């Protein structure tokens, strides 16, 4: 709904994953889903990270901590930088096998980890504000110093 009606949207972690699934289903017409929910979709656009597949005992095994993202597009403008460090807590990622198809229809990967190549941010630049991040910007935000994503998201709603 937000994408179609150009309503500002900020997808955080699982929210980013769901906006990718929605885009793949509605725009690309795929039977798309996330491996986190179930794996009987024809197109798993969200998959478990390779280094998480052998984890048998959960607890402290996620991709945790601060990671760098190299930025471009609107996200780079929002942060006023070409690189940012944000904190993470997840096991699933955008399946890189689908990036070209998503980007061809307008969902751009606008932030990527330089070491792993993982997609950290996605966006649709033609929209008022349509950004997803695999990170948790709330971990680096306070009343005195709000994370730029929150600041710009709220501005876009006014």
Provide a role label for each language-model segment.
Residues 1-7, 12, 25-158:
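Amide-donor transfer/coupling interface in amidating biosynthetic enzymes
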Residues 14-16:
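Active-site loop->helix "elbow" adjoining a glycine-rich segment at hydrolase catalytic centers
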Residues 19, 24:
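Conserved active-site segments centered on acidic
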């Amino acid at each position: 709904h937000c994408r179609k009606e150009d309503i500002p949207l900020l997808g955080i972690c699982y929210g980013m994953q769901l906006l990718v699934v929605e885009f793949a289903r509605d725009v690309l017409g795929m039977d798309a889903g996330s491996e986190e929910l179930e794996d009987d979709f024809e197109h798993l656009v969200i998959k478990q990270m390779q280094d998480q597949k052998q984890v048998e005992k959960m607890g402290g095994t996620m991709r945790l901590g601060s990671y760098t993202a190299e930025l471009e597009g609107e996200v780079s403008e929002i942060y006023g930088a070409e690189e940012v460090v944000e904190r993470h807590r997840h096991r699933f990622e955008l399946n890189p096998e689908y990036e070209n198809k998503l980007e061809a229809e307008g969902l751009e990967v606008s932030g990527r980890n330089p070491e792993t190549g993982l997609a950290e941010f996605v966006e649709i630049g033609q929209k008022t504000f349509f950004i997803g991040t695999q990170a948790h910007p709330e971990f680096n935000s306070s009343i005195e110093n709000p994370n730029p994503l929150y600041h710009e998201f709220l501005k876009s709603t006014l």
